[in-house]
Amino acid sequence: MMGRTALKITLAVAMAAGLLLGVSGCGKSAEAEKQAPASKAGTEKVLRVGGEATYPPFLFKDEHGHYVGFEMDLIKAVAKEIGAEVAYTDMPFSRFMTAVENKKVDVVISAVEGTAERAEKAAFSDVYYKKGVYCILVRKDDDRIHAADDLKGKMVTAVKGSTNEALAKKLGADQIVEAEYNADIFKNLEAGKADAVITDEPLAYYYLGHGGAEKAKTVATVPSDDGFVILMNKEDVKMQQDINGALKKVMENGVYDQLFHKWFNVSVSGK
């Protein structure tokens, strides 16, 4: 997987590339695509996928209302390997765990880290992306926060149920302003509803590169060893085997690198 240097190169190029849609263009109004009937990978030819599409360039809506991004292309490639078509349903981040637990979807792919807490209720795929660092953003005219320790006693906005929210609590934030969608954390900051945002580096760079730099700035980062995984029902051992087997093939046959280059304009190696 990619190291931090490659990630920084990735983000710098992606920011300059001007991907399809700014964060502000994604919102709560995203309607779920038609849900498919219950399925098993490789048998019913349909893989029901859940996600939260306000996380460009990983998963978002383009100007035509289509769900696109690195993760959408990746899960389609994985589904192809197991002989299935993707049926996507958009939902808030906070509903991911119940969706896989109650088998409303077969898998969730949406910048989710494989934490110990989540492992109690869901199964994971192998890691498909290492995120590198968390970013702390404040309004451009705010000079009170310069480091992670400065979040003590402050109001911090983060997506509900995310590791970003957990980090805000760990750093001593006085109040967490929860958001259902990634796009809303930046709206909360801009509206003065929070003193700072904690988010993943890719989303922070995308936001700043699509107009956010006029309103906010990055003041600190916090290292992270977390990686993004695909969630699925804990009891569905075959699904986990199928997904991991397909993901391995996609990573070995060059498709993963092609998709990575498509969305970040750089190879996995950073070249």
Walk through the language-model features, giving the residues of each.
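Short, low-complexity disordered leader/linker segments with a strong preference
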Residues: 1-46, 268-271
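Extended ligand-binding regions for polar small-molecule ligands
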Residues: 27, 72-81, 142, 155, ...
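Ligand-binding clefts/hinges and TM-proximal coupling segments of bilobed small-molecule sensing domains
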Residues: 28-34, 163-176, 180, 215-220, ...
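Extracytoplasmic small-molecule ligand-binding "clamshell" domains
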Residues: 34-112
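Periplasmic-binding protein-like
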Residues: 53, 130-138, 201, 205-247, ...
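Bilobed "Venus flytrap"/periplasmic-binding protein-like clamshell domains
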Residues: 53-54, 67-77, 133-184, 201-205, ...
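Short helix-initiation/N-cap motifs at beta->coil->alpha
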Residues: 72, 88-100, 143, 161-162, ...
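Acidic, polar ligand-binding/catalytic clefts
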Residues: 76, 80, 85-150, 221-222
